[in-house]
Structure formats: C-alpha cells, structure tokens
Amino acid sequence: MVLMIVSGRSGSGKSVALRALEDMGFYCVDNLPVVLLPELARTLADRQISAAVSIDVRNMPESPEVFEQAMSSLPETFTPQLLFLDADRNTLIRRYSDTRRLHPLSSKNLSLESAIDEESDLLEPLRSRADLIVDTSEMSVHELAEMLRTRLLGKRERELTMVFESFGFKHGIPIDADYVFDVRFLPNPHWDPKLRPMTGLDKPVAAFLDRHTEVHNFIYQTRSYLELWLPMLETNNRSYLTVAIGCTGGKHRSVYIAEQLADYFRSRGKNVQSRHRTLEKRKT
C-alpha cells in the first residue's frame, strides 16, 4: 500500500491533487499533522487502503528529524511517496489575486510576496526529498488532475516512469526536470518558411531533421547516456525520471527529439510518457 504525502507551496494545486487521488481510490486526509502519519497508517493497514495526506506550511514540524522519525515509524505494509507541487512566483501571486484568499503566513504581517518566499524556505526540506516535483504554472485544474492520474498510476505499480518533455528556453527551464539537454545548436526548421508553421510532430519537419547526421548523433549519444545509468536509477528507489529537451521556442527540434527518445525507450518495454510544454501552452 502507498502513503502519498502531498505538499507544495500554497496555490500550487494541493487540493486538486488530493481530489484526483481520492478519485483513484486513495483515502484522503487534508492537513494532518506529521506526527499522526504512523497512527493513520496503522488504522488503515487492516483495511488494505492506500492513503493520501496533504501537508502544508501550517503543519510542518519544527525540525526535519520529526518528519524522518514519522516516516521510519510507518508500518512495513506502507510505502511512503512524496509529491511536491510548485509554481513560479508570478503565477502564485496571480492565483491569490484571482481568488482573493489569504496566504497561510499572512497572519505574520507579511506581504504576499514575502509570505510566498518564506513558505518556499520552510518547505525546502520536503521539496528536497520529493519523489516527484510537478510545476503547475502552465496547467489548468483539469490538466493537473489528468497528469497526476497518468503519472501516479504508473508510480503505484512501482515501475520507473520515463518522462520526456520538450520546452523552449525563451519560456524558461522546467523545474521538474532531472536532466536538461540543450539542442539549440542543431539545424533549425524555423528558418524554412514552409516548415515554420509546423511542429516537430509533423512529417515534413521530421524529414528535415532526419537528413542531418548531427541530429542522429545527438539522439544516439543521449539515449546511450540514459541507458548507461538507467539501471542504477531504477535501483535507487526512484519512480520517475524526467528528461527535458530544450530548443529556442520549444516547437520543432526539441519536440522531434523528445518523441524520438520516447519512442526508443517505449520500444524497449519501458514505461514512457511524453509532453510538449510549448505546444500544450498554444492550445490554451
């Protein structure tokens, strides 16, 4: 059974995540004190039910040792997994402005910006040990729920999930990436007027990139690097490996290469997901 701990900065989507987990069959508890986690797990052990618990800055223990002690006191039938949700500072400020809700640290007479920054520092011990970090900055409520359903179902099966995501450097580097590869040095279809409106998912763009030896070399060397270290990553109690491929705009080269890598590892029986940040952003 799984004890899913959901944490993250206020406004990043913890309530949405908890509802998605409830839909998946988890027994969900909102804002349970950390010291009560072992007691909850023991209560549910006989019922053979996985649980999900949200922890925010208000019920964080004063020292990381308290959290570690709670984790070590869990029944052996439960496997703890930590999901950390985050979003960039401007997105969090906008969400608070839209909802007009008070930040949990507002009682300390802090400005919203200062409260967000202090909360980030207080939650760092949880963020640093998270099994999965999800950046919700560009996600709608429905997109976040669907993404969690897709990823967490793979996680519950205790199989490492490889996530290949394309992005554009001009939009920023994804904060959930384990590895980031820069492909801006490769030939750019953008400069061909016929290819410019297309994406790396279109056959003419794929044919353009497929003609270049350096593209093949990059794909081969990148997948070889990942294959070399994948066995160690799989035995390191890791459930996700997020590989981000970036080009200038996130539309052509990064999309094509992310798909090529995803197809390669999928053909070898790995649990693989792919996403394209710039293309998803254009749909909204």
Swiss-Prot record:
Residues 266-284 are annotated as: RNA-binding. SUPFAM superfamilies: P-loop containing nucleoside triphosphate hydrolases. It comes from the Bacteria. Keywords: ATP-binding, GTP-binding, Nucleotide-binding, RNA-binding. InterPro entries: P-loop_NTPase, RapZ-like, RapZ-like_N, RapZ_C. GTP binds at residues 56-59. GO terms for molecular function: ATP binding; GTP binding; RNA binding. Modulates the synthesis of GlmS, by affecting the processing and stability of the regulatory small RNA GlmZ. When glucosamine-6-phosphate (GlcN6P) concentrations are high in the cell, RapZ binds GlmZ and targets it to cleavage by RNase E. Consequently, GlmZ is inactivated and unable to activate GlmS synthesis. Under low GlcN6P concentrations, RapZ is sequestered and inactivated by an other regulatory small RNA, GlmY, preventing GlmZ degradation and leading to synthesis of GlmS. Belongs to the RapZ-like family. RapZ subfamily. This is RNase adapter protein RapZ. It comes from Enterobacter sp. (strain 638).
